[in-house]
Amino acid sequence: MAAALRALDPAPARLAVAVSGGADSAMLAVAAAAALPPGCTLRLFHVHHGLQAAADQWAAQVRGLGALLGVPVDEARVTVPPGQGLGMEAAARLARYQALAGLARQHGVRHILLAHHRNDQAETVLLRLLRGTGLQGMAAMAPFSERDGVAYLRPWLDVDHAAILALAGAVRAQCGWQAVQDPTNTDPRYARAAVRTQLAPALDARWPGWQAIVARHARQMAEAAEIVAEVAQADFATLEPADAGRSFSLAAWRGLSAARQAQALRHWLASQDAPMPTEARLAELQRQLRQLHALGHDRHLRWQHAGRVVRCERGRVWIDD
């Protein structure tokens, strides 16, 4: 923890830990409080979803932890809206990140620590593999990421869950503070809990320590994804981009290999803040662009995606709002 905080440059004046009340995030708060660099203040951010009957008790436990550590606790209450085309897990996660960003703005915090650990990382890789994710998805969770103007740090991605639980037991024995238990963590109706309770035990029995191997795989995928992204960026720069990257040369794009065409399209869409399409949808756009006649002008090409329109005119491919 101390090494992760020292690596921040410039050193932040304020840090926050996202704390649910469970053992993982609570012990991250304990570790952060112990390793806090001079001149830096710490806060605990708690998001109250109201999804569990014990949600009020969880909030009270977080306040108790804050009092124990001498750290202020800030709470945001959110309602997880149904029917966004997301499952309950994904909808709650989205609401949680939005609430954390709001708390960060309110308190002038730029960096938030998250308690994801090696076992979480391994579960994420397995889930994404089973869902058929691509290279970037197989990189799983990054030690550092930015979202909504907030820098999220995951200093425990290489820490085994057993070590965290051992620390929680020591804190309970010494201070009497008890972490809450989220019943969804072991409810197999939820995908992650199904991996944790049904798949992981079989892997533990056959391949002890498999989480470290899978986490290493995620790091390797992250490196490969970074290389692919750099190649895509370099390729796109050769496509004669114009109008702040809104358009590029169809003829130049056609000069790329099929795999690099697809990556250049992904880079282009991401640079224009367009949601990333599925592999099938992207393949359809690629097919249409490759089949346009040589002049690259086809008024019938209107590939629509997430409120945006891709069109081709005078040999250039455009994206419009």
Curated annotation (Swiss-Prot):
Entry keyword Ligase: yes
Disulphide-bonded residues: none
Keyword set, alphabetical order: ATP-binding, Cytoplasm, Ligase, Nucleotide-binding, tRNA processing
Comment field on protein domains: The N-terminal region contains the highly conserved SGGXDS motif, predicted to be a P-loop motif involved in ATP binding.
CDD domains, per database record: TilS_N
Record-linked InterPro entries: Rossmann-like_a/b/a_fold, TilS/TtcA_N, tRNA_Ile_lys_synt, tRNA_Ile_lys_synt_N, tRNA_Ile_lys_synt_subst-bd
Subcellular location: Cytoplasm
Protein name in UniProt: tRNA(Ile)-lysidine synthase
Top-rank lineage group of the source organism: Bacteria
A GO BP annotation: tRNA modification
Family: Belongs to the tRNA(Ile)-lysidine synthase family.
Protein function: Ligates lysine onto the cytidine present at position 34 of the AUA codon-specific tRNA(Ile) that contains the anticodon CAU, in an ATP-dependent manner. Cytidine is converted to lysidine, thus changing the amino acid specificity of the tRNA from methionine to isoleucine.
SUPFAM superfamilies referenced in this protein's UniProt entry, alphabetically: Adenine nucleotide alpha hydrolases-like, MesJ substrate recognition domain-like
GO terms of molecular function: ATP binding; tRNA(Ile)-lysidine synthase activity
Matches recorded under Pfam families: ATP_bind_3 (PF01171), TilS (PF09179)
Lineage start: Bacteria, Pseudomonadati, Pseudomonadota, Betaproteobacteria, Burkholderiales
Catalytic activity line of the entry: cytidine(34) in tRNA(Ile2) + L-lysine + ATP = lysidine(34) in tRNA(Ile2) + AMP + diphosphate + H(+)
PANTHER family, per database record: TRNA(ILE)-LYSIDINE SYNTHASE-RELATED
Protein residues bound to ATP: 20-25
Enzyme Commission number(s) from the entry: 6.3.4.19
A GO CC term attached to the entry: cytoplasm
